[in-house]
A protein has these predicted regions:
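Nucleotidyltransferase catalytic core that binds NTPs
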Residues: 1-149
Length: 149
């Protein structure tokens, strides 16, 4: 059985995420979605639009997804990567969406950089541009909604 992992904030889920899930599922037999927890979102964006348990419930309802896990980032995390979860889950494939590419993985300041190094150590295949070009932005959706209130 080929396990595929994707990760992200998914706050909120949008069309680009759906394309990511559909294409990632086609890469293997079992798709695990790792949603960044509320601590990670607060550190990255400064707000949480949908709490992690709500995002998890929504993700679990999407037909291409076999399993949903939430990251274990502590409050005010210094490590924004998902290396701990990658080492625990040990997927066969780590699929990255349209806004994450090899250039990003090669950039030392990117959280994808240590993830790429760990994938090499654990013999996890990294795949980029899954789901096509970046189609939408959760942050932009939230911003537009806020402007229309």
């Amino acid at each position: 059985m080929t396990k595929v992992l994707v990760s992200g904030g998914f706050d909120p889920v949008h069309i680009g995420h759906i394309r990511l899930f559909k294409e990632a599922k086609a890469l293997g037999d079992y798709l695990i979605v790792l949603a960044n927890n509320d601590n990670w979102l607060m550190a990255k964006k400064g707000f949480v639009f949908m709490k992690e348990d709500e995002r998890k419930t929504i993700l679990e309802a999407i037909r291409w997804i076999d399993e949903v896990q939430i990251t274990k980032h502590s409050k005010n995390p210094t490590d924004m990567s998902i290396c701990a979860e990658l080492a625990e889950i040990k997927p066969d494939i780590f699929a990255n969406g349209g806004d994450r590419d090899k250039k990003d993985a090669d950039t030392n300041s990117s959280s994808l950089n240590p993830e790429q190094k760990l994938c090499q150590q654990l013999n996890i295949k990294m795949v980029f541009n899954v789901g096509g070009e970046k189609a939408q932005s959760s942050s932009e959706l939230v911003k537009r909604a806020k402007q229309n209130i």
